[in-house]
Design a protein with these regions (language model features):
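Active-site micro-motifs of SAM-dependent methyltransferase domains
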Residues: 2, 21, 49
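Generic detector of solvent-exposed, compositionally biased contiguous segments
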Residues: 1-2, 11-18, 101
Length: 131
Protein backbone atom coordinates (compact mmCIF):
# COMPACT_ATOMS: atom_id res chain seq x y z
CA UNK A 1 0.00 0.00 0.00
CA UNK A 2 1.03 3.58 -0.48
CA UNK A 3 -0.41 4.73 2.80
CA UNK A 4 3.09 5.40 4.17
CA UNK A 5 2.94 8.85 2.59
CA UNK A 6 0.33 10.01 5.12
CA UNK A 7 1.43 11.18 8.56
CA UNK A 8 0.06 9.55 11.71
CA UNK A 9 -3.52 10.46 12.59
CA UNK A 10 -4.02 12.40 9.33
CA UNK A 11 -7.73 11.65 9.22
CA UNK A 12 -10.60 11.44 11.68
CA UNK A 13 -12.04 8.47 9.79
CA UNK A 14 -10.61 6.11 7.19
CA UNK A 15 -13.00 3.82 5.28
CA UNK A 16 -12.23 0.49 3.63
CA UNK A 17 -15.37 -0.93 2.07
CA UNK A 18 -15.52 -4.61 1.08
CA UNK A 19 -11.94 -4.75 -0.15
CA UNK A 20 -9.90 -6.03 2.81
CA UNK A 21 -10.12 -9.57 1.44
CA UNK A 22 -8.53 -8.48 -1.85
CA UNK A 23 -5.17 -7.45 -0.35
CA UNK A 24 -2.16 -9.75 -0.23
CA UNK A 25 -1.42 -8.66 3.33
CA UNK A 26 -4.67 -7.46 4.92
CA UNK A 27 -3.08 -7.28 8.37
CA UNK A 28 -0.55 -4.70 7.15
CA UNK A 29 -3.31 -2.70 5.45
CA UNK A 30 -5.28 -2.60 8.70
CA UNK A 31 -2.20 -1.48 10.64
CA UNK A 32 -1.56 1.35 8.18
CA UNK A 33 -5.20 2.45 8.25
CA UNK A 34 -5.08 2.51 12.05
CA UNK A 35 -1.88 4.54 11.89
CA UNK A 36 -3.26 7.26 9.61
CA UNK A 37 -6.80 7.40 10.99
CA UNK A 38 -8.16 8.12 14.43
CA UNK A 39 -10.94 5.64 13.64
CA UNK A 40 -11.27 3.10 10.85
CA UNK A 41 -14.48 1.79 9.30
CA UNK A 42 -14.02 -1.61 7.66
CA UNK A 43 -16.77 -3.56 5.94
CA UNK A 44 -16.37 -7.16 4.82
CA UNK A 45 -18.51 -9.71 3.01
CA UNK A 46 -19.16 -12.39 5.61
CA UNK A 47 -17.94 -15.78 4.46
CA UNK A 48 -19.61 -17.23 7.57
CA UNK A 49 -23.11 -16.30 6.35
CA UNK A 50 -25.39 -19.34 6.39
CA UNK A 51 -26.11 -19.30 2.63
CA UNK A 52 -22.37 -19.34 1.89
CA UNK A 53 -21.87 -22.24 4.30
CA UNK A 54 -24.83 -24.13 2.81
CA UNK A 55 -23.52 -23.72 -0.72
CA UNK A 56 -20.19 -25.22 0.29
CA UNK A 57 -21.77 -28.00 2.34
CA UNK A 58 -24.49 -29.18 -0.02
CA UNK A 59 -23.20 -28.23 -3.45
CA UNK A 60 -19.48 -28.56 -2.77
CA UNK A 61 -18.55 -25.40 -4.61
CA UNK A 62 -17.69 -21.80 -3.91
CA UNK A 63 -20.85 -19.71 -3.66
CA UNK A 64 -21.90 -16.85 -5.90
CA UNK A 65 -24.09 -14.34 -4.04
CA UNK A 66 -24.87 -10.62 -4.11
CA UNK A 67 -22.03 -9.91 -1.70
CA UNK A 68 -19.70 -12.50 -3.32
CA UNK A 69 -20.62 -12.04 -7.00
CA UNK A 70 -17.59 -13.66 -8.65
CA UNK A 71 -16.84 -17.28 -9.37
CA UNK A 72 -13.73 -18.85 -7.84
CA UNK A 73 -11.58 -18.34 -10.94
CA UNK A 74 -12.26 -14.65 -11.51
CA UNK A 75 -12.61 -13.34 -7.97
CA UNK A 76 -10.33 -10.59 -6.70
CA UNK A 77 -10.65 -12.09 -3.21
CA UNK A 78 -7.53 -13.60 -1.71
CA UNK A 79 -8.30 -13.77 2.00
CA UNK A 80 -11.94 -14.49 2.71
CA UNK A 81 -12.91 -14.12 6.34
CA UNK A 82 -15.92 -14.08 8.59
CA UNK A 83 -17.19 -11.47 10.99
CA UNK A 84 -15.96 -13.73 13.78
CA UNK A 85 -12.49 -13.95 12.18
CA UNK A 86 -12.09 -10.17 12.02
CA UNK A 87 -13.54 -9.73 15.52
CA UNK A 88 -11.08 -12.27 16.93
CA UNK A 89 -8.20 -10.77 14.94
CA UNK A 90 -8.86 -7.32 16.37
CA UNK A 91 -8.98 -8.72 19.90
CA UNK A 92 -5.77 -10.71 19.42
CA UNK A 93 -3.95 -7.64 18.11
CA UNK A 94 -5.30 -5.35 20.85
CA UNK A 95 -7.18 -3.27 18.29
CA UNK A 96 -10.03 -1.45 20.00
CA UNK A 97 -13.41 -2.52 18.66
CA UNK A 98 -15.68 0.50 19.05
CA UNK A 99 -18.73 -0.94 17.31
CA UNK A 100 -19.66 -3.81 15.00
CA UNK A 101 -22.87 -4.17 13.05
CA UNK A 102 -24.21 -6.99 10.93
CA UNK A 103 -26.10 -6.22 7.74
CA UNK A 104 -28.67 -8.53 6.19
CA UNK A 105 -31.05 -7.38 3.45
CA UNK A 106 -32.79 -4.34 4.96
CA UNK A 107 -31.82 -4.99 8.59
CA UNK A 108 -28.83 -4.00 10.65
CA UNK A 109 -28.03 -5.28 14.10
CA UNK A 110 -25.43 -4.61 16.76
CA UNK A 111 -22.83 -7.35 17.22
CA UNK A 112 -21.26 -7.97 20.61
CA UNK A 113 -19.17 -10.80 21.94
CA UNK A 114 -22.30 -12.29 23.52
CA UNK A 115 -24.14 -12.67 20.19
CA UNK A 116 -21.16 -13.08 17.86
CA UNK A 117 -21.91 -16.70 16.91
CA UNK A 118 -25.49 -15.99 15.78
CA UNK A 119 -24.70 -12.73 14.02
CA UNK A 120 -21.78 -14.37 12.22
CA UNK A 121 -24.21 -16.97 10.89
CA UNK A 122 -27.00 -14.59 9.85
CA UNK A 123 -25.25 -11.42 8.60
CA UNK A 124 -24.26 -10.98 4.96
CA UNK A 125 -21.87 -8.13 5.75
CA UNK A 126 -19.97 -6.97 8.78
CA UNK A 127 -19.14 -3.33 9.43
CA UNK A 128 -16.48 -2.58 12.04
CA UNK A 129 -15.57 0.70 13.68
CA UNK A 130 -12.10 0.22 15.13
CA UNK A 131 -9.34 2.43 16.38
Amino acid sequence: TELYQFPKQSFDYVVLSQTLQAFYQPDKVLRELLRIGKSVIVSIPNFGYWKVRTSLLFFGKMPVTKTLPNTWFNTPNLHMCTIKDLFNYCESQNIAIKKVIGVNEDKISLIKKSNLEMKNLFSKLGVFLIG
